[in-house]
């Protein structure tokens, strides 16, 4: 771990800039969510404007795709996305034209219409689920959690905190959920101060710590507020850690194989709350969001990026690479994915880009498992990482499902302690991908 990034490199990222320089090309994947890919609505040579719908799909799990740029469609072809998959994408040559579609606000819409607006806007949660589906899981839900434990992303939206809070209220209204809990890191002093100074319906927000058995329910029983804020430890809850978020904040532990809606909880992000505000109050689809760029770049910072902008253009906006890059990782050095090309675009669930130098990249050679069970000892989800990885290595993905591979939060603890240097996280992630592919193929076959 000595060669991992130092915290001081990411500590001074209070500056948030919007990338105004147009990329030479924009790559807009027709699938930016966990579901069926959209079909392109445009053809090669077509002129598009900002906000125009580029992709539409049918089914129960969809997220429409819109153009963040004016420009010309260069091609429609398979292009790599940040996860390494080749996805059918609309490739644009952006132009300086500022023309947009007519954005129509619908501030007084009823709840059923609010859900439809969120759906039409193509808003996707940081864990890749379309927001309109997350808000209506088909189960009884009593609490909406906003995961604001990514400090640098949360800081990017503090200047528009009133809009984030209004968007969160609209999500509660659209879903019919009675109460909301905003979760901050306990050491994120800047965000805690901002939320303490914020008001909802003219009243200051209640900001309370999660201590011992005092979970969010403890405070919700004593206040009449619809929304409260809690400071919950020093953990950043990544997309794979929603079960831990529900357990640690609400005190509702989930058995293996279950998800937060099974204990009456739904999770959303800060970015989606702001996007919901933009969709309902300004009529705008989901076109851009905040991304944190850290590591071996000359000017680490948080930037507001339009979806479809290649990663290399984002890094150039941060001063370019510092030295020769060894690895570029999207969405965190532990649980993220290393991209094989910086031509891959920023997409709706991108929250961060980490650049490592060659000296920082660990390239240990994997050997045979010695069955020491250290991976079992450290797994926070009480899984058998070594066993799941072995099954994945043999292509036995049904067995991986039986061993609850989908419950892995990809924290990396097992890989860190493994004396055989097995690529446990990569193998388990591969098994999860194959399991989800089988699920999607089954869904497509039945529709």
Curated annotation (Swiss-Prot):
<dbReference type="GO" id="GO:0022900">
    <property type="term" value="P:electron transport chain"/>
</dbReference>
<dbReference type="GO" id="GO:0005886">
    <property type="term" value="C:plasma membrane"/>
</dbReference>
<comment type="subunit">
    <text>The Rnf complex is probably composed of eight subunits, including RnfA, RnfB, RnfC, RnfD, RnfE and RnfG.</text>
</comment>
<dbReference type="InterPro" id="IPR019554">
    <property type="entry name" value="Soluble_ligand-bd"/>
</dbReference>
<keyword id="KW-1278">Translocase</keyword>
<feature type="binding site">
    <location>
        <position position="418"/>
    </location>
    <ligand>
        <name>[4Fe-4S] cluster 1</name>
    </ligand>
</feature>
<dbReference type="InterPro" id="IPR026902">
    <property type="entry name" value="RnfC_N"/>
</dbReference>
<dbReference type="InterPro" id="IPR049684">
    <property type="entry name" value="Ion_transpt_RnfC_Methano"/>
</dbReference>
<dbReference type="Pfam" id="PF01512">
    <property type="entry name" value="Complex1_51K"/>
</dbReference>
<dbReference type="InterPro" id="IPR017896">
    <property type="entry name" value="4Fe4S_Fe-S-bd"/>
</dbReference>
<dbReference type="GO" id="GO:0016491">
    <property type="term" value="F:oxidoreductase activity"/>
</dbReference>
<dbReference type="Pfam" id="PF10531">
    <property type="entry name" value="SLBB"/>
</dbReference>
<keyword id="KW-0677">Repeat</keyword>
<feature type="binding site">
    <location>
        <position position="408"/>
    </location>
    <ligand>
        <name>[4Fe-4S] cluster 2</name>
    </ligand>
</feature>
<keyword id="KW-1003">Cell membrane</keyword>
<dbReference type="GO" id="GO:0009055">
    <property type="term" value="F:electron transfer activity"/>
</dbReference>
<dbReference type="Pfam" id="PF13237">
    <property type="entry name" value="Fer4_10"/>
</dbReference>
<dbReference type="InterPro" id="IPR017900">
    <property type="entry name" value="4Fe4S_Fe_S_CS"/>
</dbReference>
<dbReference type="Pfam" id="PF13375">
    <property type="entry name" value="RnfC_N"/>
</dbReference>
<keyword id="KW-0813">Transport</keyword>
<feature type="binding site">
    <location>
        <position position="372"/>
    </location>
    <ligand>
        <name>[4Fe-4S] cluster 1</name>
    </ligand>
</feature>
<feature type="domain" description="4Fe-4S ferredoxin-type 2">
    <location>
        <begin position="399"/>
        <end position="430"/>
    </location>
</feature>
<dbReference type="InterPro" id="IPR010208">
    <property type="entry name" value="Ion_transpt_RnfC/RsxC"/>
</dbReference>
<dbReference type="GO" id="GO:0051539">
    <property type="term" value="F:4 iron, 4 sulfur cluster binding"/>
</dbReference>
<protein>
    <recommendedName>
        <fullName>Ion-translocating oxidoreductase complex subunit C</fullName>
        <ecNumber>7.2.1.-</ecNumber>
    </recommendedName>
</protein>
<keyword id="KW-0479">Metal-binding</keyword>
<keyword id="KW-0472">Membrane</keyword>
<keyword id="KW-0004">4Fe-4S</keyword>
<feature type="binding site">
    <location>
        <position position="369"/>
    </location>
    <ligand>
        <name>[4Fe-4S] cluster 1</name>
    </ligand>
</feature>
<feature type="binding site">
    <location>
        <position position="375"/>
    </location>
    <ligand>
        <name>[4Fe-4S] cluster 1</name>
    </ligand>
</feature>
<feature type="domain" description="4Fe-4S ferredoxin-type 1">
    <location>
        <begin position="359"/>
        <end position="389"/>
    </location>
</feature>
<dbReference type="GO" id="GO:0046872">
    <property type="term" value="F:metal ion binding"/>
</dbReference>
<feature type="binding site">
    <location>
        <position position="379"/>
    </location>
    <ligand>
        <name>[4Fe-4S] cluster 2</name>
    </ligand>
</feature>
<comment type="similarity">
    <text>Belongs to the 4Fe4S bacterial-type ferredoxin family. RnfC subfamily.</text>
</comment>
<feature type="binding site">
    <location>
        <position position="414"/>
    </location>
    <ligand>
        <name>[4Fe-4S] cluster 2</name>
    </ligand>
</feature>
<comment type="function">
    <text>Part of a membrane-bound complex that couples electron transfer with translocation of ions across the membrane. Catalyzes Na(+) transport, most probably coupled to electron transfer from reduced ferredoxin to methanophenazine and heterodisulfide reductase. Involved in heterodisulfide reduction during methanogenesis from acetate.</text>
</comment>
<dbReference type="InterPro" id="IPR037225">
    <property type="entry name" value="Nuo51_FMN-bd_sf"/>
</dbReference>
<feature type="binding site">
    <location>
        <position position="411"/>
    </location>
    <ligand>
        <name>[4Fe-4S] cluster 2</name>
    </ligand>
</feature>
<keyword id="KW-0249">Electron transport</keyword>
<keyword id="KW-0408">Iron</keyword>
<dbReference type="InterPro" id="IPR011538">
    <property type="entry name" value="Nuo51_FMN-bd"/>
</dbReference>
<keyword id="KW-0411">Iron-sulfur</keyword>
């Amino acid at each position: 771990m000595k060669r991992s990034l130092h915290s001081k490199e990411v500590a001074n990222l209070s500056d948030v800039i919007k990338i105004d320089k147009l990329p030479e090309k924009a790559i807009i994947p027709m699938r930016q969510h966990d579901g069926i890919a959209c079909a392109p609505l445009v053809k090669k040579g077509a002129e598009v404007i900002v906000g125009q719908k580029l992709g539409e799909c049918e089914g129960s799990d969809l997220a429409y795709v819109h153009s963040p740029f004016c420009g010309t469609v260069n091609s429609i072809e398979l292009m790599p996305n940040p996860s390494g998959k080749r996805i059918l994408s609309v490739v644009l040559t952006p132009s300086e034209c500022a023309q947009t579609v007519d954005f129509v606000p619908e501030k007084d819409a009823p709840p059923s219409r609010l859900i439809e607006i969120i759906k039409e806007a193509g808003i996707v949660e940081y864990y890749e689920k379309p927001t309109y589906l997350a808000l209506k899981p088909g189960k009884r839900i009593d609490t909406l959690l906003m995961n604001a434990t990514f400090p640098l992303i949360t800081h990017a939206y503090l200047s528009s905190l009133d809009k984030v809070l209004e968007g969160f209220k609209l999500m509660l209204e659209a879903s019919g959920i009675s109460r909301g809990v905003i979760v901050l890191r306990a050491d994120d002093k800047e965000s805690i101060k901002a939320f303490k100074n914020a008001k909802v319906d003219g009243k200051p927000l209640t900001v309370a710590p999660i201590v011992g058995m005092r979970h969010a329910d403890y405070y919700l029983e004593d206040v009449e507020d619809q929304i409260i804020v809690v400071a919950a430890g020093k953990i950043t809850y990544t997309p794979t850690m929603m079960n831990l978020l529900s357990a640690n904040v609400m005190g509702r532990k989930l058995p293996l194989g279950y998800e937060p809606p099974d204990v009456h909880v739904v999770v959303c992000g800060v970015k989606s709350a702001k996007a919901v505000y933009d969709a309902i109050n300004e009529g705008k689809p989901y076109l851009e969001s905040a991304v944190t760029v850290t590591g071996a770049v000359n000017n680490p910072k948080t930037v507001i990026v339009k979806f479809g902008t290649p990663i290399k253009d984002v890094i150039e906006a941060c001063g370019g690479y510092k030295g020769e890059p060894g690895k570029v990782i999207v969405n965190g050095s532990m649980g993220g994915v290393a991209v094989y090309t910086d031509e891959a675009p920023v997409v709706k669930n991108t929250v961060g880009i980490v650049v490592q130098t060659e000296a920082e990249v660990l390239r240990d050679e994997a050997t045979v498992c010695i069955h020491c069970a250290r991976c079992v000892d450290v797994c926070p989800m009480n899984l058998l990482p070594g066993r799941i990885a072995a099954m994945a290595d043999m292509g036995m993905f049904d067995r991986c499902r039986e061993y609850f591979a989908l419950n892995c939060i990809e924290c990396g603890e097992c890989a860190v302690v493994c004396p055989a240097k097995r690529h446990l996280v990569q193998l388990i992630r591969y098994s999860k991908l194959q399991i989800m592919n089988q699920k999607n193929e089954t869904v497509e076959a039945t529709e």
